[in-house]
Amino acid sequence: RGAALTALQGKDGLPYEDATCLARGFEDELWIGTTRGAIRQTRDQYHYFGAYHWLPADRVYDIVAGDRVVYIATDGGLGIIEYQPYTLQKKAAYYERHLEEWGHKRLGFTHRLYWAGEELGWVREISDNDGGYTAHYLAAMCYKYAVTGDEATRREALDAFEAMVWLEEITPIRGFPARAIWSVVADKGHKSEHGSGGLPAKGYPTPDGLWEWKGDTSSDEVNAHFYAVSLFHDL
């Protein structure tokens, strides 16, 4: 008596339909556990929380919401999602600390990490996208310095800019930037093995034999250079 039945389906925006549990959230939203992650439904939106980024595993068995925190039991362990108010500055500080502590940065460049198993852990990759990743970091530091005037941020921008310039100066072709630079004697990460068009990667040694630079630079890498370096000049 006085009850109502509501059906939520994929056609209504539900990201995944195979539900396992329901829970009322801390802001009167609905949490839905599924065999492929968890879903938060607000009045007119669905937020999806998948395995390995938000949760230890896919299958959700139960959900309990506390004060701005949600506990999600999965077949891989307990996932905890906590809601915290963030300013842009606080968010930037979080990711900058992540870059420093996890080892993304090297010689002014910003690199991708990949998981190499329990024995090796996270491994830094010297890859085709080093120039692009570094360009975006440089752009971010330029914008941050323009807003804050912080001297440490200026030094970060200068360090990344010098790495971008090095990519261009290490090649014998004026104006042509390398994709990546590998230290023959010092680097212990993973060197990219693939080149453009399905061909194997090729490293070109510098005259002193201490470095190798990777060519086959693509248009998006070149665009990244123009984008970041122009910001560095203007800001």
Q: Language-model segments: what does each one mean?
A:
Residues 121-166:
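General structural concept
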Residues 82-89:
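Short loop/turn segments immediately following beta-strands, especially the blade-tip
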Residues 1, 35-39, 76-79:
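Loop/turn residues immediately N-terminal
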Residues 2-4, 42-45, 84:
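Short loop/turn segments that connect beta-strands within beta-propeller blades
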